[in-house]
A protein has these predicted regions:
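Short beta-strand micro-motifs within the conserved protein kinase catalytic domain, predominantly
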Residues: 97-107
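Activation segment signature within eukaryotic-like protein kinase domains
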Residues: 139-140
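C-terminal regulatory tails of eukaryotic serine/threonine kinases
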Residues: 277-347
Length: 347
């Protein structure tokens, strides 16, 4: 007697999207003499991000500059190494491209990224306070698509927040800042990192977490886009942790019912039952009423009209990024690292 074969569930386009994007083929070693620093736009834990111009091509880029001596002293080389290894091996329409590095300079380690001219979601939220439902849905779907691609490579992002979501000239988003991203070698990891208001309960409790913490952060982001603040905000970090552990979410009366539902599903305190973490994975997200009739295919191929188009005047426009005030930093001393002691030299 023939055994009845199980019916295989057809994969959604979102699940198949990882097959159309592969490794970053634009990555190369760079000559620092080809670039002119325009101005500083951002400080990270380990370095600064600048807008710079390729003098030969007359083209803008982001450049992240780390002092090697500071990296070695901080014993935090892992985050920089992770960013290099991950971004040099991924390529996706919603993830910023690492275009090259210079690792042979004895003083600095330099990462060169594509320039994303439209500013950040954080800036847009400061202007608009809260976003229309369709705008929030568009951006959330884009991030879900990027997360699905990363998760299929066993990479977790761990740093979702409006500041790290940038707009290209057409209003589509790019995830940036991969210093906290990690490729999971084991099933779980335990490090507390990211923005406290976006911490998942399992991260705070140090129970071990995986992609579950990324799905939690999607619920926090959607709430912030629609309401104008995060659901567990408090000026005291310890109270933020307490609120997250309690898991009580307060919603305004006028919030869309399907938005409220998907936020609750993402902010499920049980990480094994959380939306995106169950057996059906990403398919459960696609089938949420919040995404009913949403065109995932045309989103992926940039065929949808973005809800917000940033104002950009030419290829050299930097007006969407505020110039960071130059201050004397503790690590401004130019300490050279010998090749023999330089862990970055042979990358």
């Amino acid at each position: 007697m023939l055994k009845k074969q199980p019916i295989k569930r057809k994969k959604t386009l979102l699940e198949r999207s990882s097959t159309i994007v592969s490794v970053n083929e634009n990555f190369e070693k760079i000559d620092l003499n080809d670039y002119k620093i325009e101005y500083k736009v951002c400080k990270t834990n380990l370095g600064f991000t600048y807008i710079c111009k390729n003098k030969k091509m007359n083209k803008l880029y982001f450049m992240k500059i780390f002092k090697k001596a500071k990296l070695l002293a901080s014993k935090d080389i892992e985050h920089v190494t992770n960013e290099y290894l991950i971004l040099s091996s991924v390529y996706h329409p919603f993830i910023i491209e690492l275009r090259g590095i210079n690792n042979t300079n004895p003083i600095t380690l330099n990462f060169l990224y594509e320039y994303i001219p439209g500013g950040s979601l954080n800036t847009l939220l400061k202007i608009q306070k809260r976003l229309p439902l369709n705008s929030a849905r568009f951006y959330l779907a884009s991030i879900i698509t990027a997360f699905d691609y990363l998760h299929k490579k066993n990479i977790i992002y761990r740093d979702l927040r409006p500041q790290n979501i940038l707009f290209n000239k057409n209003g589509y988003i790019k995830l940036s800042e991969f210093g906290l991203a990690k490729k999971l070698e084991n099933e779980v990891t335990f490090t507390m990192c990211g923005t406290p208001e976006y911490y998942s309960p399992e991260m705070i409790r140090k129970n071990g977490y995986n992609k579950s913490t990324d799905f939690w952060s999607l619920g926090i982001l959607l709430y912030e886009m629609l309401i104008g603040c995060t659901p567990f905000f408090d000026s005291d970090p310890l109270k933020i942790y307490q609120k997250i552990n309690q898991g009580k979410i307060l919603f305004p009366k006028k919030i869309d019912k399907n938005a409220k539902l998907i936020i609750k599903h993402f902010l499920n305190m049980n990480q094994n039952e959380r939306l995106g973490c169950t057996k059906n994975g990403i398919a459960d997200i696609v089938e949420e009423p919040f995404f009913k009739n949403f065109d995932w295919k045309n989103l992926l191929f940039h065929n949808l009209e973005a809800p917000f188009i940033p104002e950009i005047n030419g290829n050299l426009d930097t007006s969407n990024y505020k110039k960071m005030e130059d201050k004397i930093e503790i690590d401004d001393e130019n300490i050279e690292i010998d090749k023999e002691k330089d862990p970055f030299y042979n990358w």
